Amino acid sequence: MELKGKVINFLGDSITEGMGTTACEKIYHQIIKEKYDMEHAYNYGISGTRIARQIIPTKDFTKHDLTFELRADIMDKNADAVVVFGGTNDYGHGDVPFGEIDSEDVYTFCGAVNSLIKKLKKDFPNKKIIFMTPLHRLNEEEPSEPDSKTLKDYAAVIVEICKKHNVGVIDLFKINPLDPNDKELVPDGLHPSDKGHRVMAEVIAEKLLEI
């Protein structure tokens, strides 16, 4: 897709919000905006949020329960595209089952992805909808959710569900642009640094141009 002059909504969690960066303009989507002369790159990232609903509400961190689908209503409806970047918090601290690939039960991860895609297609008809799979992270093979799925399982099912719905995917998990053990790029093993966001931006922009 052409990026120049475009408006893109970026819906995500702490990485999209910019945790780990030193300034807003250092976030991957703002880097892309400036480099490719986009009109707007709207930041709809909220730290700690998940794609799926939570069975037991999160104490003290209630904003974590503002799922992607709940927040989709506030996004700019005139955008040319929506980029969804999530799943790592569903893996990291979600309490719902992984679910079945054809489910629309938002109290499962698979169901919530299906439901989110359905909503985005309704709200943004004839617009580009693109999902990005989670980046590699430390403890990605130490699941806490009830079905003991690894982060690799989450990434794989996002790809599979998106293919089913004919939705674009940037498979960052497969591309693996950032080593979570590299302290310069990912200091805490999860949130990229300014330099990490620059690396991400290059990869994401290249893939967006191909979609």
Predicted regions and their residues:
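Short alpha-helical interface patches
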Residues: 10, 17, 173-177
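Conserved G/P- and acidic residue-centered "switch" motifs that form tight phosphate/ATP-binding loops
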Residues: 12-13, 193
